[in-house]
Amino acid sequence: MSFRALTMRSAVARTALNNTIRSARVATPYLGIRHSSSTPTPDPKTKAASLIDALPGNTALTKTGILGTSAAAIIYGISNQLYVINDESILLLIFLGFSGLVAKFLAPLYKDFADARIKKIGSILNSSRERHVDAVKDRIESVSELQNVSETTKVLFDVSKETVELEAKAFELKQKVELAHEAKSVLDSWVRYEASLRQLQQKQIAEGIISKVESELTNPKFQDRVLQQSIAEVEQVLANIK
């Protein structure tokens, strides 16, 4: 019973495989005609080499072993009806082929874009790091210049203290000068007052003497006495001359 089932399965698998091969043979000339009409037919050796290179593995033996094992597994699965080719299988193959094409053609472009992006970001980070390092160095230099800030502050404090003392002395001298100037002005005003008072007194004395002399000159007795004295002096002079 089991042998008959295996025989029937083998017959069904051979029939399905023959139908697939026949349909592939029918479709192959049509595809070949369309391909030849649009582009020249590529070299089979080159195409086979590209397919082998697309397989995973490092050596040709490994890639050939993977290809043979995969083909044997597919044939075994189809012959034992473990896997039946249907519409979903065709869609899966088309999707896998499209994914392979995308991985083959778009992966290098994406790799170039990613490398350029990484390089740009790396350059930005490097420039930022260099600027940060320069800023830190400048800060260190500015701080190192202030390492003697205590001594400088002490000197500045001494200078400011001396400046305050000099300003205090200058203010004191200024006050003394202003006081002396004020005292001098007071003394000058007092001297001027005394001089004016003395002049007034002298004027009053002179006026008193002049008025007294004038009053005496108007006195007849004084005039007679002066006249007699003058006559006596003249007579004496004449006597001396003789």
UniProtKB/Swiss-Prot annotation:
Q: Which domain of life is it from?
A: Eukaryota
Coiled-coil region: none
User: Which InterPro entries does the entry link to?
Assistant: ATP_synth_Bsub_B/MI25, ATP_synth_F0_suB
Endpoints of the signal sequence = none
Which keywords describe this protein according to UniProt? Answer: CF(0), Hydrogen ion transport, Ion transport, Membrane, Mitochondrion, Mitochondrion inner membrane, Transit peptide, Transport
**Main localization of the protein described in the UniProt heading:** mitochondrion
Q: Name one GO cellular component term.
A: proton-transporting ATP synthase complex
Task: Identify this protein by name.
Answer: ATP synthase subunit 4, mitochondrial
What organism is listed for this UniProt entry?
Candida glabrata (strain ATCC 2001 / BCRC 20586 / JCM 3761 / NBRC 0622 / NRRL Y-65 / CBS 138) (Yeast)
